[in-house]
């Protein structure tokens, strides 16, 4: 079980797509799952099965396999086989009830990759074994790692700020 965390525009989705591409190139089954429980994802033109998840790097895209709710995701995960990679990007849009299904699938040998979990999901993991990949980005002052972002007119590229800026 791998968990990717970081501020917006820190490279989480790019890193996730790179890992999905790597695993698919090895011949592994790779599936990308998004939540249908929040309009932030489903109102996007590509936020559907067969759509393409992208990031700020226009060369990085990956086809979305399923757009489903938490209950369906839990049932679906129970059917997945060892050695496959199942990715939940923007995972914070799933209910925290999905966490036991992630853990159970992981224990069966299914590789689970979780991008941007909610605080409740992290709390539900409760110290269970997972590999945390925390992506850092420099503050705009270039002296320290950013701890927050600020959006102005551009909602795609936020300004990264540290505690002192």
Give, region by region, the residue ranges found by the protein language model.
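Conserved P-loop NTPase "ATPase switch" module shared by AAA+ and STAND
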Residues: 81-94
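Short linear motifs at secondary-structure transitions and domain/linker junctions
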Residues: 5-10, 88, 109-112
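Conserved P-loop
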Residues: 1-80, 120-127, 154-160
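Short, hydrophobic beta-strand segments that form beta-sheet elements in well-ordered domains
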Residues: 31-34, 86-89, 112-116
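A general structural motif
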Residues: 27, 82-84, 109
């Amino acid at each position: 079980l791998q968990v990717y965390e970081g501020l917006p525009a820190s490279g989480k989705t790019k890193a996730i797509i790179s890992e999905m591409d790597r695993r698919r190139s090895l011949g592994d089954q790779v599936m990308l799952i998004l939540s249908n429980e929040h309009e932030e994802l489903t109102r996007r033109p590509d936020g559907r099965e067969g759509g393409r998840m992208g990031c700020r790097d226009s060369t990085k895209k990956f086809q979305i396999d399923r757009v489903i709710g938490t209950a369906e995701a839990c049932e679906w995960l129970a059917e997945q086989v060892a050695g496959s990679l199942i990715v939940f990007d923007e995972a914070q849009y799933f209910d925290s009830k999905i966490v036991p299904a992630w853990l159970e699938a992981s224990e069966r040998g299914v590789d689970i990759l979780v991008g941007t979990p909610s605080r409740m999901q992290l709390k539900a993991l409760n110290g269970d074994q997972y590999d945390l990949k925390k992506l850092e980005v420099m503050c705009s002052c270039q002296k320290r790692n950013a701890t927050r972002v600020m959006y102005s007119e551009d909602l795609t590229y936020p300004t990264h700020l540290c505690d002192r800026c």
